[in-house]
Amino acid sequence: MEMEEFAPSYYYYVEPEMGYQPQQPNPMEDLITVYHLDDISRQVARTNEDGTKAVKLRKSYKNQITDLSGKFSSIPNRENRKGGEIAHILFQNNPDMMNQVHRSPDMTDEQWREALMNVDASLFQAPNMDWEVCQSVLSQFDRSYPTEFQNDPNFHVDDLAFDLDGTGKSNAKKRKNRSNGSSMATPNSEMQDDVKRRRLE
């Protein structure tokens, strides 16, 4: 069965008539083997092939990565559930993340297309998507890494128009830049204050 028989055309967001050249190197390949790094990887592996513990992460290494985001002494996975309350979403295999749709013989092309579209939409609905958890995770990033988000004074999260509550409405609250735990007026409001002063003069 060819791809066109079960994948609707709306899946192709890039020009479908254009030829596609596979990326090189292909990230789906075993790049360690491709670049002949098997010996080195075995020497620094933290687990053996049979699953037993091998090389521990040296404390001196830990000191070198203390300022890196996403560092883990214990790597999160599905089994240890170190991913927190969103672990069940993070570590699911792709087929597990959505209900599978099977085409019955009496299903028309339009019914089949609608069924596939409903599956896509379900990814953004409960239980696949918890908007409160998403909002909590984004706010944690904002608090944990303030310099990454505040370096550019022209960047405002609200400009991204994230629909965090699933209502279709963006956050209309007044934007504020946080600095050392205090609120500071945005550049726009400072400009308005300057205009007010000139009027008084």
UniProtKB/Swiss-Prot annotation:
Keyword Nucleotide-binding found: no
GO CC term, one of those recorded: core mediator complex
GO molecular function, one term: transcription coactivator activity
GO biological process terms held by the UniProt record: negative regulation of transcription by RNA polymerase II; positive regulation of transcription elongation by RNA polymerase II; positive regulation of transcription initiation by RNA polymerase II; RNA polymerase II preinitiation complex assembly; transcription open complex formation at RNA polymerase II promoter
UniProt keyword list: Activator, Nucleus, Transcription, Transcription regulation
UniProt feature coiled coil, ranges: none
Matches recorded under Pfam families: Rox3
Region feature Disordered, mapped onto this chain: 166-201
Subcellular location: Nucleus
Family per similarity comment: Belongs to the Mediator complex subunit 19 family.
Function: Component of the Mediator complex, a coactivator involved in the regulated transcription of nearly all RNA polymerase II-dependent genes. Mediator functions as a bridge to convey information from gene-specific regulatory proteins to the basal RNA polymerase II transcription machinery. Mediator is recruited to promoters by direct interactions with regulatory proteins and serves as a scaffold for the assembly of a functional preinitiation complex with RNA polymerase II and the general transcription factors.
Subunit organization: Component of the Mediator complex.
Name listed for the protein in its UniProt record: Mediator of RNA polymerase II transcription subunit 19
Organism: Candida glabrata (strain ATCC 2001 / BCRC 20586 / JCM 3761 / NBRC 0622 / NRRL Y-65 / CBS 138)
Lineage, opening ranks: Eukaryota, Fungi, Dikarya, Ascomycota, Saccharomycotina
